[in-house]
């Protein structure tokens, strides 16, 4: 079944411009408060100009172009401008440093880079010291260094016509993007995403939160991340809604932005919810138009209830990963919600729990969450130039091994337990990091928490807790361990405590555990 009607991204944008014309498509707010607005017609013209810019710089179908940008209009222009000419976007996490950025450039084979002056010195060094295929850099800033091989993105774009100059034949099976995974435990892998993947993601995510063309979807998630692209942007555009892209998250500013833009849909991760809850209560906390808050793992029931009560919202759970493109398990429109369940499998997917021998498990038993989809259509196509890694997680019949543990109840509701790599083996017992973190997070003095396993000669692994305290608080080891002993089984109580000012996180809010080992 062809859900998207054979429509690639070039056709999508031409149709959106025709149908929605002067309706607002995109609003971007910078950290400095500068706001840019584009109608569907204007945005399609900017996308065409950007496509023509790339063509004049020698980019052709199949070429890879890297983007190292914070949330900004240029990211959207480049993403779809490249797609229109059959080129491939390689977004780079804007928080990565030289070594990691160079590694992605090398492994993606990108020949052109779009970035800002903030990151340019790093790429100067990469060009001098690393072997890459990079031959040109476009900077989005007005002021340019007097260097060869560097151009002004804005100046070149504005010189281009608003109609497309180069339109090679496209297929929905063509690669549109190579998105490198966050690599919190190992080197990132390049997830190959097709035009079909992105078009399907738009329809699916719009269905998931029942989007209409009068909706306003606001996100602070980074544009180089799958959530922003496929759960937010593609959903909003596919429905003809308005997409609001905020440059960076600020707990102090977020709720005001929700109110200012009259957002009806937004998305949150646990870090956002916890930082919003420590903001001073306001009489305007419930003055908003939000219908749904898309939510991604993991939060204790106490935290969830407190957030929903204070702000008068409900959470729409969604479970997925870069490889699944969208939240393939989640709450369904007009369906019952069963916290702490992560929901049921969405349309076009199958899900089941399997044991260590790849056999399905009955309801109630914990095993690996496995998802069945169609590679290159409803799930990722493959890992770029890495068939061994692809074969490790993706079976020939479309079953994807997520590496997450969970269980399912009799009604098909799934429950997340933990990442397999986040299970601590302690004296013959398996201990879930997420379970402990949810318990410890309820301590009134603790703002942020992560637990990890460290080598122990007697018990396989010992448990160490890293905590960030609320401002002005102090916490003794005696108080911490007493709290743990009162709220969890003895074998789950951490052996060590370290209080820190912050925890290392990637762009999507996930703890970078390898930095805490």
UniProtKB/Swiss-Prot annotation:
In terms of SUPFAM superfamilies, this protein maps to: Acetyl-CoA synthetase-like (SSF56801)
Enzyme Commission (EC) number:
6.2.1.48
This molecule's function is given as:
Catalyzes the transfer of CoA to carnitine, generating the initial carnitinyl-CoA needed for the CaiB reaction cycle. Also has activity toward crotonobetaine and gamma-butyrobetaine.
> What pathway does the annotation place this protein in?
Amine and polyamine metabolism; carnitine metabolism
What family classification does the UniProt entry report for this protein? Answer: Belongs to the ATP-dependent AMP-binding enzyme family.
Which Pfam families does this entry report, sorted A to Z?
A: AMP-binding, AMP-binding_C
The GO annotation for biological process reads: carnitine metabolic process; fatty acid metabolic process
What the entry lists under HAMAP family is as follows:
CaiC
The name of this protein is Crotonobetaine/carnitine--CoA ligase
Q: What keywords were assigned to this record?
A: Ligase
* One GO MF term attached to the UniProt entry: carnitine-CoA ligase activity
């Amino acid at each position: 079944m062809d859900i998207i009607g054979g429509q690639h991204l070039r056709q999508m944008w031409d149709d959106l411009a025709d149908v929605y014309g002067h309706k607002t498509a995109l609003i971007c707010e910078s950290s400095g408060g500068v706001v840019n607005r584009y109608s569907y017609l204007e945005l399609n013209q900017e996308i065409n100009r950007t496509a023509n810019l790339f063509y004049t710089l020698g980019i052709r179908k199949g070429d890879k172009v890297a983007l190292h940008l914070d949330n900004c209009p240029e990211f959207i222009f480049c993403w779809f401008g490249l797609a229109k000419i059959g080129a491939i976007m390689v977004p780079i996490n804007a928080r990565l440093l030289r070594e990691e950025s160079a590694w992605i450039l090398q492994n993606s084979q990108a020949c052109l880079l779009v970035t800002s002056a903030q990151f340019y010195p790093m790429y100067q060094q990469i060009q001098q010291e690393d072997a890459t295929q990079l031959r040109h850099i476009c900077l989005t800033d007005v002021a340019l260094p007097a260097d060869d091989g560097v151009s002004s993105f804005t100046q070149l774009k504005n010189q281009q016509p608003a109609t497309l100059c180069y339109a090679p034949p496209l297929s929905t099976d063509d690669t549109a993007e190579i998105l490198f995974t966050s690599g919190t435990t190992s080197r990132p892998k390049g997830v190959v995403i097709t035009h079909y993947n992105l078009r399907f993601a738009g329809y699916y995510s719009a269905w998931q939160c029942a989007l209409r063309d009068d909706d306003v979807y606001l996100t602070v998630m980074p544009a180089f991340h799958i959530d922003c692209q496929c759960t937010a942007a593609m959903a909003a555009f596919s429905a003809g809604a308005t997409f609001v892209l905020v440059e960076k998250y600020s707990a102090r500013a977020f709720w005001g932005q929700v109110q200012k833009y009259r957002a009806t849909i937004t998305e949150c991760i646990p870090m956002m919810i916890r930082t919003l809850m420590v903001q001073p209560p306001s009489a305007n906390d419930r003055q908003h138009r939000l219908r749904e808050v898309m939510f991604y793992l993991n939060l204790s029931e106490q935290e969830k209830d407190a957030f929903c009560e204070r702000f008068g919202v409900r959470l729409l759970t969604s479970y997925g990963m870069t490889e699944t493109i969208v939240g393939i398990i989640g709450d369904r429109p007009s369906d019952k919600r069963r916290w702490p369940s992560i929901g049921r499998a969405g349309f076009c997917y199958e899900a089941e729990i399997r044991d260590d021998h790849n056999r399905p498990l009955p309801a109630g038993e914990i095993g690996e969450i496995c998802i069945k989809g169609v590679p290159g259509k409803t799930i990722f196509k493959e890992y770029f130039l890495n068939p061994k890694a692809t074969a490790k997680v993706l079976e020939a019949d479309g079953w994807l091994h997520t590496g997450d543990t969970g269980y399912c109840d009799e009604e098909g509701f799934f429950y997340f337990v933990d990442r397999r790599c986040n299970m601590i083996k302690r004296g013959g017992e398996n201990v879930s990091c997420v379970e402990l973190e949810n318990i410890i997070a309820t301590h009134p003095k603790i703002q942020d928490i992560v637990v990890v396993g460290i080598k122990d000669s007697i018990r396989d692994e010992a448990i160490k807790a890293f905590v960030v305290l609320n401002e002005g608080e102090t916490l003794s080891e005696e108080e911490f361990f007493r709290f743990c002993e009162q709220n969890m089984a003895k074998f789950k109580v951490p052996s060590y405590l370290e209080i820190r000012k912050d925890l290392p996180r990637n762009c999507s809010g996930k703890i970078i555990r390898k930095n805490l080992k």
